[in-house]
């Protein structure tokens, strides 16, 4: 069921910037987004970038010690969100980076919000082409343990996430 909600150009631009890892200067790398939240506009007609809800690559190791824990704290208690998280992880063979699409729908979110976000999920996923991993979570218990995300990224082959052993 489609909701008729449109995906803003800003969302697509952020996604493309996060997806493309072209050779960049160290300053450009620092400005790249590590994690972002997307929300519905006030009129509920567009999916937009949520102001101030982002982690930059340059913040990691500076103002952000653990980007995954910081990301989890950005999720609202009582409303839904979409998110993109640029996961850095290690398997037994190599280090990897992958974008993860996250649909956050906490159980205490208003029913109308859950319905609009759920019915708009396909619209945003169609615009974010090439995402290999998706995580849907309905409570903090499902996201606060980094093993949940590691499971989506590669199961038991993943040995660390964001430099923290599992």
Curated annotation (Swiss-Prot):
The modification Phosphoserine is found at residues 3, 8, 41, 156. GO terms for molecular function: actin filament binding. PROSITE patterns: ADF_H (PS51263). The modification Phosphothreonine is found at residue 25. Its main location: nucleus. Can bind G- and F-actin in a 1:1 ratio of cofilin to actin. It is a major component of intranuclear and cytoplasmic actin rods. Interacts with the subcortical maternal complex (SCMC) via interaction with TLE6 and NLRP5. Interacts with C9orf72. This is Cofilin-1.
């Amino acid at each position: 069921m489609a909701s008729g909600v449109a995906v803003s150009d800003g969302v697509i631009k952020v996604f493309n910037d996060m997806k493309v890892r072209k050779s960049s200067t160290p300053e450009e790398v620092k400005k790249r987004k590590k994690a972002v939240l997307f929300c519905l506009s006030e009129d509920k007609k567009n999916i937009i970038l949520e102001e101030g809800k982002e982690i930059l690559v340059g913040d990691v190791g500076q103002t952000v010690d653990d980007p995954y824990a910081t990301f989890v704290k950005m999720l609202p208690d009582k409303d839904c969100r979409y998110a993109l998280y640029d996961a850095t992880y290690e398997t037994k063979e190599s280090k990897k980076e992958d974008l993860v699409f996250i649909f956050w729908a906490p159980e205490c979110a208003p029913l109308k919000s859950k319905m609009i976000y759920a019915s708009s999920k396909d619209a945003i996923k169609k615009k974010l082409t090439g995402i290999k991993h998706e995580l849907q979570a309905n409570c903090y218990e499902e996201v606060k343990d980094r093993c949940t995300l590691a499971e989506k990224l590669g199961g038991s082959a993943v040995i660390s996430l964001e430099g923290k052993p599992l």
